[in-house]
Structure formats: structure tokens, C-alpha cells
Amino acid sequence: MPKVVPEYKEIAKNKIIQAAIRIFSQKGFHKSTMDEIAREVGVSKGTLYTYFKSKEEILKEIWELNNQNILDLKKTFKEYDCSEVLDELYHMMINSSGLNLSFEITALSSHNDNIKKINKESYESKLESLKDFLQDQQEKGTIKNDTDADILAQILTALYTDVATQLLIGIDSKKVHEKWIKSVTAILK
């Protein structure tokens, strides 16, 4: 068996993940198959299984990559104003190819313990990262500090979910963006 160089392995994994996002978004997680993902990437099913043992494993990797932007919030946007960062989060959300997938995964969590665990870990890590970012912003004096950062993170997460819902059901993205900005300002200033 030929040796696979680490760089190639990462490229191959990334291609699989991107294909899985497309397939999951088009067909839904439950109806998607490993065969379809392999076909989309242009590899054999056996090759696919050398990288990922199941759809749940691919999903976990997708979730970890999607979370990375939020998990690195404090580090990535250290010198930015809080409102700029939250505006960037909005733009990341509307440009996400997996917006509908996110809602499907949340729904699947009630029936699949593996997916529930992945989703719960993802949610908790995003919330913790957002809380840390908000605490840092409070210490800098860029946002109000009379409300606990954990509560602010919960409120912003709920707002984010509502905005995602509005976009998913087809409400005009410019109107949604305006409401996002006004809501974030009302919550944080």
C-alpha cells in the first residue's frame, strides 16, 4: 500500500468534508449515503472509509470546522470592535452552505444519541467561546458590563438562531441584517 503524505491526507479529508456538506445540504443528513459522498469526491467507498468510518464521523468533523471560526473569536478578532466582529459573524452565517444542515442536525439530535452528543459539544464550545470573547470586550470597555457575559452569550446565540431561521425561510437578507445590527446594538451597548 502506498504511503499517504500528511498534506495529501488533509487535502483529501477537506474534499470529502466539502462534498459531504453539499450532499447533506441537498438531500438531508439522513437520506445521504457514504456512496453518494464518495461519488461526489470521485473516490471509492473504500477510500472514503479510510478517512471516515461513518456519516456521523464526517458530521463531527464538519461541526468542528464550522465551530473553529467562533472558537477562535477572541484570538482572530482581538483588535476589532465587537460590533464589527458580530457583523462578520452575520456574514459568515449568510454565506454558509450548511445553514439548512444546521437545523436538520438539531432536529436529528432528538432521535440520534451520537448526533445529540456532537451537537451538544458543539453548542457548549461555541457558547463558551462567545462568552470569553464578550468578557474580553467588557474588560476593554467596548460593551456594557452590567450584564453577565454568559447571559449576553445566551441572548446573542438565541438571536443568531432566530436570524438563521429568518434567512432559511426566505426573509429578505437586507432586512434581516438591519434587524441583526439593531438587536446586537440594543443588547450590548
Model regions: which residues?
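Amphipathic alpha-helical segments used for helix-helix packing
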Residues: 94-117, 165, 169
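Hydrophobic alpha-helical connector segments
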Residues: 61, 72-99, 149-156, 178
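Hydrophobic/aromatic-rich alpha-helical bundle segments in the mid-to-C-terminal region
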Residues: 116-120, 138-184
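Short hydrophobic/aromatic patch on the recognition helix
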Residues: 42-52
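Amphipathic alpha-helical packing segments from all-alpha helical-bundle domains
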Residues: 75, 94-97, 113-140, 151
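Alpha-helical DNA-contacting segments of helix-turn-helix folds
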Residues: 59-66
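C-terminal peripheral helix-coil segments that are non-catalytic and often amphipathic
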Residues: 83-91, 128, 132, 136, ...
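Basic, helix-initiating cap at the start of DNA-binding domains
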Residues: 1-27, 32-40, 57
